[in-house]
């Protein structure tokens, strides 16, 4: 395809990761199924470069985001007699995140204006899917808004679609949007990453450059960085770099010495805030992870499963 014919929408937004493929599925049978919902500009089943055996997953890229939405709305999908799991693909860099594989229905929205009301959040986010609950967090004592909120959808795909977008404007102000994870989901992401570093990163052209020995789709694990928090976190989520600890209200542990102050208020001036800066909240961790019903905002730019048919990295401990 020439540049003049290339779709205008970014490729990353038009790409789906397809997990749980039958080992019998080929590029052709994958294409035959998913082209029912639009024009495919690329379709590939990822294979071991040596044995040519399917890795149990692949990617399809549509000509438009609208076609991607149509395919996702048609779930569940069955290819060659096997139910598969399509997810919006995330970039190689983003897929390195410890919990990139987790599917959640709740997002954290930080950096919202004090005069932001529920209808502002609903007006913006309802374009991504059906909203079930909107919670604007306030200080229990003073009632003052703390600068962040949670929005819960009825489908994880709404969350996946939101977090791969780099810019979000609510009530006339750029905000920080991330997946919101419960304490249990955080623990799951941590355990799936720990000790498996380097077992599943891959890159290179379409079929080559794979690392690791496990086959995705038959119990094999793929992972990115070992140890939740990686070198920045010293083994614990956040650590010195990405902490969302501290003592907030409502049983939530928000805080940290950077983008949240010790009372759990969002402090946009102190954060490494900006769509192109990775969105890490700088500063020390100021509290433990204890307590029930906690939600943590994960590092920015996660979407679920990551990768590209040309240069990709899959960073999860998900099993099919």
Swiss-Prot record:
Biological processes per GO annotation: mRNA splicing, via spliceosome
GO annotations of cellular component type: catalytic step 2 spliceosome
CDD domains, per the entry: RRM1_hnRNPA1, RRM2_hnRNPA3
Compositionally biased residues, Gly residues: 197-218
Keywords: Repeat, RNA-binding
Gene3D superfamilies: 3.30.70.330
Annotated ranges, domain RRM: 14-97, 105-184
Protein name (record): Heterogeneous nuclear ribonucleoprotein A1-like 3
Species the sequence originates in: Homo sapiens (Human)
Gene: HNRNPA1L3
């Amino acid at each position: 395809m020439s540049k003049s014919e290339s779709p205008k929408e970014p490729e990353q937004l038009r790409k789906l990761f397809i997990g749980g493929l039958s080992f019998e599925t080929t590029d052709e049978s994958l294409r035959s199924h998913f082209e029912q919902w639009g024009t495919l500009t690329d379709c590939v089943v990822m294979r071991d470069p040596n044995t040519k055996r399917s890795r149990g997953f692949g990617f399809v890229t549509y000509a438009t985001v609208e076609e991607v939405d149509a395919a996702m709305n048609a779930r569940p999908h069955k290819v060659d007699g096997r139910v598969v799991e399509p997810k919006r693909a995330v970039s190689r860099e983003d897929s390195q995140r410890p919990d990139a594989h987790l599917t959640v229905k709740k997002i954290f929205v930080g950096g919202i204006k004090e005069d932001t009301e529920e209808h502002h959040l609903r007006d913006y986010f309802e374009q991504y899917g059906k909203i079930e609950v909107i919670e604007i967090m306030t200080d229990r004592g003073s009632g003052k808004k703390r600068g962040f909120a949670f929005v819960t959808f009825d489908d994880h795909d709404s969350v996946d679609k939101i977090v791969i977008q780099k810019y979000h404007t609510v009530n006339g102000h750029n905000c920080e949007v991330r997946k919101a994870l419960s304490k249990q989901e955080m623990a799951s992401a941590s355990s799936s990453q720990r000790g498996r570093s380097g077992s599943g990163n891959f890159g290179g052209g379409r079929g080559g450059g794979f690392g690791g020995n496990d086959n995705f789709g038959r119990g094999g694990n793929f992972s990115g960085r070992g140890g939740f928090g990686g070198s920045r976190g010293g083994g614990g989520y956040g650590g010195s770099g990405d902490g969302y600890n501290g003592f907030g209200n409502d049983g939530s542990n928000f805080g940290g010495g950077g983008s949240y102050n010790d009372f759990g208020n969002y402090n946009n001036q102190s954060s490494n805030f900006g769509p192109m800066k990775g969105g890490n909240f700088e500063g020390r961790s100021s509290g433990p992870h204890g307590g029930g019903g906690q939600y943590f905002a994960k590092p920015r730019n996660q979407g679920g499963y990551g990768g590209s048919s040309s240069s990709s990295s899959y960073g999860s401990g998900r099993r099919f």
